[in-house]
């Protein structure tokens, strides 16, 4: 949890926003997945948002759904993902690592056991994408017990009560949605969300990172101009993986270049 606090303090002192890439663990293979993480961090990623492959990722569009399928075809399991995470953490002891999960995977061995495993692997945060705030108590309780930051999604139409709950129960960062719907670059992020950012700040919520449809440096600049602390980009990154499956060296080079370009846009 403290890694996020340290990160945001460092970025503030450097007058920068955060750029956080998202990928699916094990896509397209476990070995290449580790090299992809290296490429993202070499490019300047401030934190990582990673998912464990799931058979029915409701919040995701076709690009990230295909990433899940590729990982499954490489026989990637949650156990293997935690082995990959252990290697990533050993190599990068300081970078914040967040997991984006679906509830069934958290339930599989029991909620408490899942968060204990996250603690043992030195994960910083968990966002459970298909659990609304009203059903989040057992998840956030287990998260806090094990020192894991519970991350909550703030939709663009969030009402005041939800904003207050996010501020009260969220830690690490707040996942600010650019728009409703599923992930993907096919639909761009909508207008800047100044009003939500201002309310979240007023209620002392964890710093907002804006995601969904972020695929260009210009959008990163707009996100920061709206007051968000940074941007998360997933589909644009996974698209680079998808388009270069047969040429991994080019894939890794393009990933590093993309992250570097997006990170450069975070200078305030």
Curated annotation (Swiss-Prot):
It catalyses: (1S,2R)-1-C-(indol-3-yl)glycerol 3-phosphate + L-serine = D-glyceraldehyde 3-phosphate + L-tryptophan + H2O. GO terms for cellular component: cytosol. It is an enzyme of class 4 (lyase). Its EC number is 4.2.1.20. One of its GO terms (molecular function) is tryptophan synthase activity. Pathway: Amino-acid biosynthesis; L-tryptophan biosynthesis; L-tryptophan from chorismate: step 5/5. Disulfide bonds: none annotated. InterPro entries: Aldolase_TIM, RibuloseP-bd_barrel, Trp_synthase_suA. The active site is at residues 49, 60. Keywords: Amino-acid biosynthesis, Aromatic amino acid biosynthesis, Lyase, Tryptophan biosynthesis. Belongs to the TrpA family. The alpha subunit is responsible for the aldol cleavage of indoleglycerol phosphate to indole and glyceraldehyde 3-phosphate. HAMAP family: Trp_synth_alpha (MF_00131). This is Tryptophan synthase alpha chain. The lineage of its organism: Bacteria, Pseudomonadati, Pseudomonadota, Gammaproteobacteria, Enterobacterales. The gene is trpA.
